[in-house]
Amino acid sequence: AKISGNFRIGAPDGLSNFVLPVVISNIQNHHPNLNIQILSLPRVFNLSRREADLAIMVTPPKKGRFVTKKIVNYNLHLAAKNTYLEKNSQIKSKNDLKNHNIIGYIPDLIFDPTLDYLSEVIPNRAPDLSSNSVAVQMQMLNLGIGVGLAHDFALAHFPDIIPILKNKINQERAFYMVRDRDDLASEQSNLIASLLDNGIKSEVKRLQSNN
């Protein structure tokens, strides 16, 4: 089926930076008349106000006229750049982290408790360097200035950032596709949703298999 027009996807910035560009490129190759927009924001999207045609979320809404479908699980591991690990004291347990610079989210700007990855690993420890953006956190890690929790699908883009304590620390979350119930009547919207679902699933799995 031919699809065309504008279609806006709201997604967390980690997914937007490290997964969606490949996914939408593949879709656009098959549907050149489709204009795909990625709205990358570290917060929950308001589909009722049509901020986006479809949203990818880590925690789906519990109320409202929405249809939710789980897409795929993803993992996070503690990680640091190889040069950082060579220059600093060894990390053999979580207790060793107290001697290291920690990189993470800005605590009071975590809009979804599910994204508070760090407090599960290092309770009562605020990050020394923080950002509300996954992409910025990855660039900090890549500079070799600290240790942080990184998405496995993002680590695939940074070969010099190495997972640490891989067998001891493994956070698992999931991405969900959230749509307005009224959009289920649109054949085009259903097709795009299906393409995104399959594309995100396969790209996350491909990237995670590199670790």
Locations of regions flagged by a protein language model:
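Short, well-ordered beta-strand segments
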Residues: 8-10, 55, 103, 148, ...
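Central regulatory/effector-binding core of bacterial HTH transcription factors
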Residues: 4-64
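Short amphipathic alpha-helical coupling segments at ligand-binding clamshell hinges
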Residues: 184-198, 203
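C-terminal regulatory
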Residues: 49, 61-175, 202-211
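Short, surface-exposed acidic/glycine-rich loop or hinge patches that mediate macromolecular interfaces
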Residues: 14, 182-183
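Residues that form or flank phosphate/diphosphate-binding pockets in enzymes
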Residues: 18-19, 88, 113, 187
